[in-house]
Regions:
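Extended, loop-rich substrate-binding clefts of extracytoplasmic carbohydrate-active enzymes
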Residues: 91-158, 172-178
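Extended amphipathic alpha-helical segments with heptad-repeat/coiled-coil character used for oligomerization
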Residues: 202-218
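Beta-strand-rich recognition/accessory modules
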Residues: 32-50, 55-57, 224-315
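Short hydrophobic/aromatic-rich beta-strand segments that constitute the beta-sheet cores
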Residues: 54, 141, 150, 163-165
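Solvent-exposed N-terminal domain segments of exported/luminal and surface proteins
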Residues: 35-120
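Acidic (Asp/Glu-rich), glycine- and aromatic
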Residues: 157-199
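Low-complexity, Gly/Pro
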Residues: 1-32, 313-315
């Protein structure tokens, strides 16, 4: 298995020029390039205070998130969807598998469709590197991870980033685990809190040094992290998960690397043929002092909670 981190720097290092993009109107999304060979290798997206990047080498998934020009989630990690197949390994965004007997050849998530929208209009004129800005952004993509059909989207509007992963199993697949969505919070965050819709369940301080730790929160619905030095914090709220599948919060505290949050499902289970389920998160940010950060985080949680349709899990 190969992890493919920070590869956009290697591939795009020589591209120092920019080509203007165009936004279509009546033509519709069908005018966007069909072939991945014509898709952008890196897209920098700015909507209000939020900035993110869509990374081609990571199979057109997000790569880091900034808020008010401050790094909230690092680029040096995988986002999107990853599955761990029993006796095979990790496969998905930024996780590739070596093909047995074929040195140098890898198996990847097969992305078959990519559409970008700014201010609800399709973006045309794809170029290797693009800068997009507006009042709203949406990315829609379709892919296959072996027998799994995946439809995923990223939407930024009104100060909230919403990410969705819809999985459909065309055949049964034996899994160690699946991570439908994940976020690599900055290692600069020093404190955290987990909670449900009733309030905070757990709070703590991240490690400053030492070996990484990977706890699991099975009953929490959201995670908040905060960096007193910047006065900024991030929240991931689990809006939706299938009623017949778990939606746990697994997190890795890796000092100096990241504070990684993963939505975790199908742990040591077979995903049955015909499974059809949606996982969705809302990402929001806030400013606060060291004294009132939990209060500000809870207020932001309430705002993100309003995005939940339905309120608990997929019907």
């Amino acid at each position: 298995m190969r992890k493919f981190f920070n590869s956009s720097v290697l591939i795009l290092g020589a591209l120092t020029w920019q080509v203007p993009m165009s936004i279509g109107g009546a033509e519709g999304p069908s005018t966007q390039p069909v072939s991945p060979a014509n898709w952008p290798q890196k897209v920098i997206v700015t909507v209000g205070d939020i900035r993110t990047r869509i990374d081609g080498p990571k199979m057109w998934t997000m790569s880091g998130i900034d808020f008010q020009d401050t790094v909230m989630a690092t680029e040096d990690s995988a986002y999107g969807t990853v599955v761990t197949i029993r006796n095979v390994g990790h496969l998905g965004s930024a996780h590739f598998l070596d093909v047995p007997g074929k040195p140098g050849e890898v198996e990847k998530e097969n992305v078959t469709s990519l559409q970008l929208f700014m201010d609800d209009k399709p973006v045309m004129g794809f170029t290797p590197m693009m800068n997009l800005s507006g009042k709203s952004f949406r990315m829609e993509r379709k892919s296959k991870i072996r027998v799994l059909d995946l439809e995923s989207s990223v939407s930024i509007r009104d100060g909230v980033l919403i990410e969705t992963a819809h999985l459909h199993a065309t055949k049964a697949i034996d899994l160690r685990v699946t991570y439908p969505l994940m976020y690599a919070w900055t290692p600069e965050a020093t404190v955290y809190a987990f909670g449900n819709d009733q309030g905070i369940q757990k709070r703590g301080v991240f490690l400053k040094e030492g070996k990484l730790d990977t706890p699991l929160e099975k009953t929490s619905r959201w995670m908040a992290v905060f960096n007193p030095a910047s006065g900024k914090g991030s929240i991931c709220y689990l809006l939706k998960h299938p009623s017949d599948a778990d939606g746990w919060l697994q997190w890795t505290d890796a000092p100096g690397i990241y504070r990684k949050l993963r939505i975790m499902s199908f742990v040591e289970k077979v995903m049955p043929e015909g499974f059809d389920g949606t996982y969705q998160t809302a990402i929001g940010f806030f400013t606060a002092t060291e004294q009132d950060w939990e209060k500000q985080a809870l207020q932001r949680v309430d705002e993100l909670k309003a995005r939940a349709r339905p309120a608990t899990s997929e019907l």
